[in-house]
Amino acid sequence: MSMDSYKIGLGNLDTKTRRNAESNNVSFWNEEAKKLSWFKPWTETLVWNSPFAKWFIGGEINASYNTLDVHQANIAKKPAILWEGEDGTSRTITYADLYTDVCKFANVLKSLGIKKGDRVTIYLPMVPELPITMLACARIGAIHTVVFSGFSAASLRDRIDDSKSKVIVTADVGYRRGSSIDLKGIIDESISGLNFVEHVVVLKRAEGNLQLGPKDSLWHELMNGSSDKCEPEHLESTHPLFILYTSGTTGKPKGVLHGTGGYLTHLNSTFQWAFDIKDSDIFFCTADIGWVTGHSYVVYGPLLHGATEIMYEGVPDYPDISRIWDIIDRYGVTIFYTTPTALRM
């Protein structure tokens, strides 16, 4: 076997591919970007002004289009998300379902005054409405900023204040180790006095009455009256897709901004190389979407490739240490991406 045909465990990334990348990385990424669907081609691949890079100048693209619209003709009925809650409840969301819900919530955001460039903070547990909100933002050119649902009101407030988000999307509760977490109460505390926050959209999950304030609206009520038709915005390649904040362990959290075209190109290619994804695969990444691994390997990466992914709300050892392995067995997971800590349990 020649070295040029030898696979190193990274899918299609063979020696020849690596040599091409090393010899002229700008030309290499120029070719990789062509694997995505662009509304308008770019005129310049890279403008580098250290430490800032601008990729695919002049090109126009949309992340929601590349994860949803491109699949509707061929795999609309294929499961996109297989969701399981900690209590064992489950949902199956096809690519057609996801497309419809994303379009509807994109129109909800428009009705709340959100336009291209506005920021939307998402403080949701690991439920399908989280990627739906992310993709709805991407569809209309809003910039999503997801905050891990385990963060305190003070940590959440820092991030909302820095991003100046006009709309917050949250839930009344999340579930962890059999207990409910009052997410809405944390939101109310975090936005007290932040007058630039105009609306809070609340996904109601728990039984009983939910006390709503003047800025609050219920997810299901807004969705019921929303159109399922929403054309994707044609966005410049450098248009921000999302802001994700660092953990803040070494100082004030820093918002890291990811541009659309560069992020999608890199992720689309590296996801294929790392996982060698096939149409029949069931992909399961245990990362929380509140972190960049979750953005890339629970949301954008699998959906770019038309994969079926597992999404789990809960901890890996509840009600016992076999939980993750039970999920793998039940859904026939073929690719499993997790941490060494989880494997050592």
Language-model regions: role of each:
Residues 77-79, 201-202, 213-245, 252, ...:
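Conserved pre-ATP/AMP-binding loop-to-beta segment of ANL
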Residues 124, 145-161, 173-175, 179-182, ...:
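ATP-dependent adenylate-forming carboxylate-activation enzymes
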Residues 264-282, 292-334:
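Conserved AMP-binding/adenylation subdomain of ANL enzymes
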Residues 64, 81-135, 152-157, 214-224, ...:
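Conserved AMP-binding/adenylate-forming core of the ANL superfamily
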Residues 125, 167-186, 207, 312-317, ...:
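Adenylate-forming
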Residues 87-88, 167-237:
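ANL superfamily adenylate-forming
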Residues 46, 67-94, 204-211:
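AMP-dependent adenylate-forming
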